[in-house]
Amino acid sequence: MIHTNLKKKFSCCVLVFLLFAVICVWKEKKKGSYYDSFKLQTKEFQVLKSLGKLAMGSDSQSVSSSSTQDPHRGRQTLGSLRGLAKAKPEASFQVWNKDSSSKNLIPRLQKIWKNYLSMNKYKVSYKGPGPGIKFSAEALRCHLRDHVNVSMVEVTDFPFNTSEWEGYLPKESIRTKAGPWGRCAVVSSAGSLKSSQLGREIDDHDAVLRFNGAPTANFQQDVGTKTTIRLMNSQLVTTEKRFLKDSLYNEGILIVWDPSVYHSDIPKWYQNPDYNFFNNYKTYRKLHPNQPFYILKPQMPWELWDILQEISPEEIQPNPPSSGMLGIIIMMTLCDQVDIYEFLPSKRKTDVCYYYQKFFDSACTMGAYHPLLYEKNLVKHLNQGTDEDIYLLGKATLPGFRTIHC
């Protein structure tokens, strides 16, 4: 009897000690990275499993010897230990928090954010609802579809209907060249795409959108080879020396965008572009007359910005949305489903800005000039994929506007 009681006490001590150790390890690891949190979960389960086996093994003799004196107590002890052994922590992945705010920025980026609020280069005077208006994911998709007009400058738009522009703009609407497609991929230029091995998956889509000067050569395994649309900012078209000659800019449909003063119409924007890319645009069209090359209407970025401000928890940078966010909305207009790669960071998250350059800055993930943090909040809210896809692949999945019913 004394021997049995000693065994019971020893088993209880071991149980308490191991549980205490698991809690300590969990608290310490909780401070670590996304990946450490995921590994800890697996280790916790293994420890609990071993703990259950150990407790069951050491108590089996105690239960059998004491069951003759108190059989009900023996069954109760055995049942509780089996329950412990079967317990599994639920799968969870630390991914982008859709309620992120400026409080999540490091001090340097907080200062930049405040500076842009005071600068207000584009003369933003938002008078809409918010900030902090709450939408369900379904309602927000409808709100975007109904209030953000994805359209290109046309030959009938002044001053593009003058003799100065005759023959330069594409005659066909982009809708006759692009889509409708089923599954589409939007491939960011993030440094975390390096070593992702996502190339084959990306190329498996019906259409692929890339940004600015992001290459595929030498990076095929990670980013694929297909380019259906390339969205470029006006700075690249104006200042990139290789733009007129590099074959990178001869593949797929090209779209250039340039920010205007807040909600300016086309004539006002034309008089005061952010970058005067018009001459280079014309030169390119002379060199490559058969290359589809469109100009995004300047109203669209600010229509999107208004919604970002409406739903965000605070004032956002009064600067236009990023090319990444514009590209996502463009593809939601043309596709039934849009898979977005490394816009929401995966476990490969890094301060390396681009997969094809060694340039380090946390602003490339969190945003500085563009309201990138709030754009990521929106995408996370709309995501129909899993947190596991975000964590492992950096993939968010959004439905196209044609597939939703409002």
From Swiss-Prot:
Keywords: Disulfide bond, Glycoprotein, Glycosyltransferase, Golgi apparatus, Membrane, Phosphoprotein, Secreted, Signal-anchor, Transferase, Transmembrane, Transmembrane helix. GO terms for cellular component: extracellular region; Golgi apparatus; Golgi cisterna membrane; Golgi membrane. It comes from Homo sapiens. Glycans are attached at N149, N161. Monomer and homodimer. It comes from the Eukaryota. This is Beta-galactoside alpha-2,6-sialyltransferase 1. Disulfide bonds join C142-C406, C184-C335, C353-C364. The chain crosses the membrane at residues 10-26. Residues 1-9 are cytoplasmic. It catalyses: a beta-D-galactoside + CMP-N-acetyl-beta-neuraminate = an N-acetyl-alpha-neuraminyl-(2->6)-beta-D-galactosyl derivative + CMP + H(+). CDD domains: GT29_ST6GAL1. The modification Phosphotyrosine is found at Y369. Substrate binds at S189, N212, N233, S322, S323, G324, C353, Y354, T365, Y369, H370, K376. It is a single-pass type II membrane protein. It is found in: Golgi apparatus, Golgi stack membrane; Secreted. InterPro entries: Glyco_trans_29, GT29-like_sf, Sialyl_trans. Transfers sialic acid from CMP-sialic acid to galactose-containing acceptor substrates. In B lymphocytes, generates neuraminidase-sensitive lymphocyte cell-surface differentiation antigens, such as CDw75, HB-6 and CD76. Residues 27-406 are lumenal.
